């Protein structure tokens, strides 16, 4: 694999967002919040630019197909959403409900709900697969099986929890 695993990249983004909001809740300094948010945005942008340039230099071969698929397990997302809402309910009924805590929970719930609809753009090349433009996997790293009855190709990539089903034999 060359690049960043897109599944863990988005989890890292959620942790960065949670840490920024937590620091805001602790310090209550809007200047520190703006500096952290801007610094994180610049850092992530620089990392993405570096990785995309690095991946552009890789010899991928000819583009065969481009598909969009959803990764992740919906059961874990629902459990995480229930945990966050349960914690929000606990804080609400304990009487220590702050406006900043409301914002924090709105961010986490919105991020979790948005993951239900997150689709990844997958480009299939002769020499491998490019996911979201930030991760390139060669065919040696991918476990590929075909289901000729349903005319499907099933790809299992290490580090991505869900199999990718393509409605065409590659």
UniProtKB/Swiss-Prot annotation:
Gene Ontology CC terms: plasma membrane
Intracellular or extracellular location(s): Cell membrane
Residues passing through the membrane, by range: 6-26, 31-51, 91-111
Membrane-topology descriptor: Multi-pass membrane protein
Recorded superkingdom: Archaea
Alphabetical keyword list: Cell membrane, Membrane, Transmembrane, Transmembrane helix
Record carries keyword Membrane: yes
Keyword Nucleotide-binding annotated: no
This protein's name: Uncharacterized protein MJ0795.1
Organism name: Methanocaldococcus jannaschii (strain ATCC 43067 / DSM 2661 / JAL-1 / JCM 10045 / NBRC 100440)
């Amino acid at each position: 694999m060359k690049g960043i695993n897109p599944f863990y990249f988005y989890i890292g983004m959620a942790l960065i967002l949670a840490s920024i909001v937590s620091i805001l809740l602790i310090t209550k300094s809007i200047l520190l919040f703006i500096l952290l948010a801007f610094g994180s945005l610049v850092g992530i942008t620089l990392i993405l630019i570096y990785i995309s340039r690095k991946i552009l230099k890789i010899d991928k071969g000819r583009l065969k197909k481009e598909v969009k698929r959803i990764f992740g397990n919906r059961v874990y997302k629902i459990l995480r959403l229930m945990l966050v809402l349960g914690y929000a309910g606990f804080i609400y009924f304990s009487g220590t409900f702050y406006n900043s805590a409301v914002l924090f929970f709105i961010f986490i719930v919105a991020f979790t709900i948005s993951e239900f609809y997150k689709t990844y753009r997958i480009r299939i090349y002769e020499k491998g697969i490019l996911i979201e433009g930030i991760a390139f996997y060669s065919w040696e790293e991918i476990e590929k099986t075909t289901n000729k009855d349903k005319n499907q190709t099933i790809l299992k990539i290490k580090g991505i929890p869900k199999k990718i089903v393509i409605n065409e034999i590659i």
